[in-house]
């Protein structure tokens, strides 16, 4: 009957374009359509932007804290670990960018068509929790920077609330265009380079030991604390939500996917840009490690307390001078105490410079976190919210628990230590980004001739296994040292571990099928991906995507 309403499943089945990805960016950056040469600076400039936004995750307050702790605990010995982490991160981020360019969709959109409904929703909730955890780190870093800049006039709880307003303000810049928005991020990265570079200059670290720690892959005389710190560096650098983010950011460039040479060209320039962006990130992180390796390694709380009192010309307010307790424990090394150490040693201006750097790190990463959450919601559950609503949701989820810690913890020391738990949360979530990205880029029905080659597949699998093994080791050690193994913690840990391992195994099944290591099993809960949601317009004689597989109403009902 005319005007009769159809059930959602029937409508989706008749209109597969409803499942096509919505335009992520209303206005895309044009790329000059000229014959590709070996290399073009003009084209590299056109593709420059997404890689720098991606690199923000390598410079967030959680990473900065991990860096300064690495320097304070292990001297210059772990800089090579930072270098290896950046190289592994680059190779994995390349996969995410390649996926976005070739498929025309970002990871969350692909997951919508790839996994059945319930597993997909579980994956979405896990990704969202990783984003909220990362966002909490940015909130903490920003609140501490306001506290330091105001010499305690702006309390922590007020600094936490300010992050709501400033995020709205900065994201408003997007209305002026993608390029201006990206330029603002580059400005914040420049602020970090200048501020942390200033601290490097005044502390004058030993360059020989710094380069030795960078290129000699060993840790002579390292104890368990140093090994754990090396593990923490890798966990802090490779962030789960960053793969989802990067695969979406590359869609800001208008790539003519009807022409294979343009797809190849985009992949090349995005990789070059990402490599340069992560090189800048590595330099900035190295500056931070070196400053605190030179200044805090081997120092006790009493040593730095004495420095604060004996340096009468540092201009530090008296309340800062008692922040380091009068004991012979290893000096406290977190974002807050690091700023006080710099102020006591080099003058209060060094403290302000440090706070500005942390503020830039917090502001830039909190905006990319909001972006990542927006892409995840639009892709996984096909809901597109106005950006102000998305900010309000993300900020609330991050701010409410952070405010609770600030109000009830009784001091800034406890809010800084919350970063350790949040880094652990990121480690738990990492498999839920690594396994899907490996799955999608290995699937010939999505990537076609751009799927992972055999050598790249082996390298990616090895890197992923190394990262996952390191993370599991860190988690096991962290749970043991934090909660201990007793009659209460053991059953809870086992219960959570069972669910965790089962879901990882579920995702791994799809990965092995995509890599063609095993044949698919046709069951309700291991349904085949909906391949007619994907296209390959550069293939002139390709099979009509809509005929790749036929989907029953039962399968559709599981997915939507």
Swiss-Prot record:
Task: Provide the disulphide bond pattern.
Answer: none
Tissue specificity comment = Expressed in dopaminergic neurons (at protein level). Expressed in intestine with a weaker expression in the most proximal and distal regions. Weakly expressed in the hyp1-6, hyp7 and hyp8-12 hypodermis and in head and tail neurons.
Q: Could you tell me what induces this protein? A: Induced by pathogenic bacterium S.aureus. Repressed by high levels of Mn(2+). Repressed by high levels of Al(3+). Induced by low iron levels.
Q: Where is this gene product found?
A: Apical cell membrane; Cytoplasmic vesicle membrane
One GO cellular component term, please give it. Answer: apical plasma membrane
Q: Which GO terms describe its biological process?
A: defense response to Gram-negative bacterium; intracellular iron ion homeostasis; iron import into cell; iron ion transmembrane transport; manganese ion homeostasis; manganese ion transport; response to manganese ion; response to metal ion
Name of the protein in its database record: NRAMP-like transporter smf-3
Q: Which organism is it from?
A: Caenorhabditis elegans
